[in-house]
Amino acid sequence: MENNRNFPARQFHSLTFFAGLCIGITPVAQALAAEGQANADDTLVVEASTPSLYAPQQSADPKFSRPVADTTRTMTVISEQVIKDQGATNLTDALKNVPGVGAFFAGENGNSTTGDAIYMRGADTSNSIYIDGIRDIGSVSRDTFNTEQVEVIKGPSGTDYGRSAPTGSINMISKQPRNDSGIDASASIGSAWFRRGTLDVNQVIGDTTAVRLNVMGEKTHDAGRDKVKNERYGVAPSVAFGLGTANRLYLNYLHVTQHNTPDGGIPTIGLPGYSAPSAGTAALNHSGKVDTHNFYGTDSDYDDSTTDTATMRFEHDINDNTTIRNTTRWSRVKQDYLMTAIMGGASNITQPTSDVNSWTWSRTANTKDVSNKILTNQTNLTSTFYTGAIGHDVSTGVEFTRETQTNYGVNPVTLPAVNIYHPDSSIHPGGLTRNGANANGQTDTFAIYAFDTLQITRDFELNGGIRLDNYHTEYDSATACGGSGRGAITCPAGVAKGSPVTTVDTAKSGNLVNWKAGALYHLTENGNIYINYAVSQQPPGGNNFALAQSGSGNSANRTDFKPQKANTSEIGTKWQVLDKRLLLTAALFRTDIENEVEQNDDGTYSQYGKKRVEGYEISVAGNITPAWQMIGGYTQQKATIKNGKDVAQDGSSSLPYTPEHAFTLWSQYQATDDISVGAGARYIGSMHKGSDGAVGTPAFTEGYWVADAKLGYRVNRNLDFQLNVYNLFDTDYVASINKSGYRYHPGEPRTFLLTANMHF
């Protein structure tokens, strides 16, 4: 493990590869620049280059009024073309184009994460996922069939969206009707019985009206994982009125249904760094790894969810420079699941004989039955104007939002132990039955914000923004009395066993002030340097709508605790080269997170904890030539505890689930009019694992490289095929690991996906 910890070889290779890429681009840029100058000297008219399909020039969120190249933040925009070329069908797969971002954490103890459980720069970002700038609640997997582009903003986003994760946010932009008619359809088959079909129909009606319909159906097994299946269907109709006029109305609806088999992972026995949890179980030190195909759940396990979202947006151009928008959205995400996972540790192992093939491990049933709802109305005004010689690019607005969550209490499910090496899933514990011990959370928010970019001179810009949030959170929860184990309560006199008893009933109100400020200087027409500073806050209950009583306990949701606060400073540079077809960026960053909960010497808890994430990131997106496209990046990040208890398994101050080095690159080349080839590579460095007193579990996950490839063939203007190969060299790796380290999710083996794309 020591080599993986210090990365002497892997670090060199990834840095050398990316440095070589950048060095290789330089002479090309110089040559094209010289050619452009020669054309200018000959007074020829040179047409502007076609924007790259791999590098959208503008965020679709009106809060970001400047082009991506002039935004003083680290921002990656993953276009629809990238998603199509890679065959990425969900958000987690699309985010593989962003270095250091991924689903690295597999949950705590017996609990396992579901859906898009994203970590970014040392923090859980799964509750900072937005659709069209509006928070999307729920631990579900988000399909990309109705997605125009994915925008990843690193650093605090509190000024942009209110309470959020301290290190970044993710915004999925929905497809909208457009003023041209066409039909796009796809049919895919692949490894592990993968079957998927999509339909995208856009039809113009009259001069200013258009309708659009996106449909998706998918059914597949998880490659390399027995018994794990996924099935989802979606439909997204929309209509637009007033296209091309000063008044536009958009109506959208989204419905997605999923029927999946959750995966609790497999034991870490045999992984580097594993040792038996006790002397009596020492045979596990030499018994080898379990088969990665093993399924430790039951045939009754399920993860069902339904998403319904209705949106109305009205836009009015007051004049050529000023637009007002009003968006109303109602959304509901319902999810219920029964997920079985193993319980590691010596006390959970049963040894009928000395043969490890007869040993069993305890299983636990994780359950969830939850309904999330959001109702919001947002008004935004954008305007460009001058005050004297100073130009202004303003975005301002107000937001009213109500978010509610109900966690329905369910009766516990008891499961038999499972054989460590030969698990049997033919167990039928039945479904979930509600017991009335529910938890209800509601947060009402009123927010007002204002951003302005000031053009001081032709080359120098200042920008700033402030957001004020007034929030009120109410929370109550009940427990079925008379149970056993952690959190059990006795029944009050006269109350029957199993009856719900309210244990928490509290509320919290407050105000949040988030702000950001930056400056940008254009060194040339194509390149700039910038600095930025931003402050973001997350109040108690802001992450999960749950509150805890004041005065005792280590929950960050205690009503007497202050909001978590993040301060980020960034200095960077962005360059548009090769006739502005290719965007190169580099940035140094530091995020300090304050008000973390820590234990005092007397056993009480205070908010003196501090964390820090710092490092640098470089990225590339766009076209090297009209036929050669790429997107990628590299980051080095150091995430540590600055004040408080160390949480890594090895006792160091490092934050877990954060690769110190990460690299990603995807490149595609149009070899002929009909043939295209693509290839990509990703590197995720070794990561520390969290600690909860587990004995013998790996302290690190090993770093790994994964390569992908694509071959495309165009039959005619109406039909083309593409073959995607994932994990080309069939690399074995740990995709995610849980906090105790007793179980992990293996990475997907080599798989194939063949897609027929039709255009009319």
Swiss-Prot record:
- The UniProt entry lists the main location of this chain as membrane
Q: Which UniProt keywords apply?
A: Cell outer membrane, Ion transport, Iron, Iron transport, Membrane, Receptor, Signal, TonB box, Transmembrane, Transmembrane beta strand, Transport
Q: Which GO terms describe its cellular component?
A: cell outer membrane
Q: Which GO terms describe its molecular function?
A: siderophore uptake transmembrane transporter activity; signaling receptor activity
Domain TBDR plug residue range list: 67-175
Motif: TonB C-terminal box; annotated at 743-760
Describe its membrane topology. Answer: Multi-pass membrane protein
Alphabetized SUPFAM superfamilies for the sequence:
Porins
Q: Kindly indicate where the leader peptide sits in this chain.
A: 1-31
What does this chain do?
Involved in the active transport across the outer membrane of iron complexed with catecholate siderophores such as dihydroxybenzoylserine and dihydroxybenzoate. It derives its energy for transport by interacting with the trans-periplasmic membrane protein TonB. Can also transport catechol-substituted cephalosporins. Receptor for microcins M, H47 and E492.
Matching NCBIfam families = PRK09840.1 (NF007349), TonB-siderophor (TIGR01783)
The Swiss-Prot or TrEMBL record describes its family as follows: Belongs to the TonB-dependent receptor family.
- What is this protein's name? Catecholate siderophore receptor Fiu
Protein's organism: Escherichia coli (strain UTI89 / UPEC)
Instruction: Please name the gene that encodes this protein.
Output: fiu
